Amino acid sequence: MKRIVILGAGESGAGAAVLAKVKGFETFVSDMSAIKDKYKDLLDSHHIAWEEGHHTEELILNADEVIKSPGIPNDAPLILKLKAQGTPVISEIEFAGRYTDAKMICITGSNGKTTTTSLIYHIFKSADLNVGLAGNIGKSLALQVAEEHHDYYIIELSSFQLDNMYNFRANIAVLMNITPDHLDRYDHCMQNYIDAKFRITQNQTTDDAFIFWNDDPIIKQELAKHGLKAHLYPFAAVKEDGAIAYVEDHEVKITEPIAFNMEQEELALTGQHNLYNSLAAGISANLAGITKENIRKALSDFKGVEHRLEKVARVRGIDFINDSKATNVNSCWYALQSMTTKTVLILGGKDKGNDYTEIEDLVREKCSALVYLGLHNEKLHAFFDRFGLPVADVQTGMKDAVEAAYKLAKKGETVLLSPCCASFDLFKSYEDRGDQFKKYVREL
């Protein structure tokens, strides 16, 4: 009997373990951290052996195949040992893809992928299609394949997940953009990160579709290298050479495969970045044959994504916006660009090799003050202090950051949490960071 070992027992790992067990493999799960009770219960209910708090190498190195959590780096010592002895190391998505014939609509990009994924899922769901949501959001793809049946899966893919995917095929691949992110995981080499993102197109055939932002210089440069077999569906803000989706005369237009149009002001999501998200989602739905009426309705009634430019409250004339999902500089750029008042920006956290020059002009133009929130704010001081803005340095947590921002903000201004950084220095996740922000804003 083939032995499958799963490293990491979160949503992805626990789901992969259930699918492996259901498919008749000897299955073992190992997690260096504590396993959440709900995942222990899931594993126990399927009689799957597990360990937590350590990795017992003799129980792992004898695997025929290993499924690893996206959070484990490829250069972790245990992963290097497995690779050195020739043991295949794959992702949960790669494993799950072997056991379903569903159509796969996969979305990646440095920014916008969660909103676009959620929006595509909303359109498909609103059209009464049998669809699952998976990847970075939703339930584990492997668990859904094991326990449910769907005709379509809408899957958000990070570069970490794409790294360990080899034979998986996206029927529709969406690449929103590529800007520097996670370079600490890619030897601080931008090309390594670009290569990871472009893995979403591997294995695509002439029957498949590749949707991408036409104005992204990196994507355009890489397209010339790759010679893709899939049909290309570029989108842009305005009508231009090659773009099949764009805005013209305040109207959203998609020209292929079926002509579609709607008034831009009817889109539920506002802002330039959200226009791109809506265009990519509209093309995806169009390719799936969803009616124009259903696409229009879903694009106009979508509620948005938590922690992404989420309006929290207005306190004594000051607006508070939660953009905790902005874990890189480019995300913060989009957030600042959308601000219509002077802004107190809360930023900081675990720096991933950030270059803050991208937001320099916007910070000078839009910000009235800055709050640095993190255990190590030296890089922020070195870059931003020269702007001469009032600064608060907070190393204790979100409560103090919110109170500091509130004191710095004037009536009619906005406090924006858009950190540019990962959350893991002071918080469990970007969700935890955003939830704490909302909690302490509401306590003001």
UniProtKB/Swiss-Prot annotation:
SUPFAM superfamilies: MurCD N-terminal domain, MurD-like peptide ligases, catalytic domain, MurD-like peptide ligases, peptide-binding domain. It comes from Bacteroides thetaiotaomicron (strain ATCC 29148 / DSM 2079 / JCM 5827 / CCUG 10774 / NCTC 10582 / VPI-5482 / E50). Belongs to the MurCDEF family. Its main location: cytoplasm. The gene is murD. Pathway: Cell wall biogenesis; peptidoglycan biosynthesis. Keywords: ATP-binding, Cell cycle, Cell division, Cell shape, Cell wall biogenesis/degradation, Cytoplasm, Ligase, Nucleotide-binding, Peptidoglycan synthesis. It catalyses: UDP-N-acetyl-alpha-D-muramoyl-L-alanine + D-glutamate + ATP = UDP-N-acetyl-alpha-D-muramoyl-L-alanyl-D-glutamate + ADP + phosphate + H(+). Disulfide bonds: none annotated. This is UDP-N-acetylmuramoylalanine--D-glutamate ligase. Cell wall formation. Catalyzes the addition of glutamate to the nucleotide precursor UDP-N-acetylmuramoyl-L-alanine (UMA). GO terms for cellular component: cytoplasm.
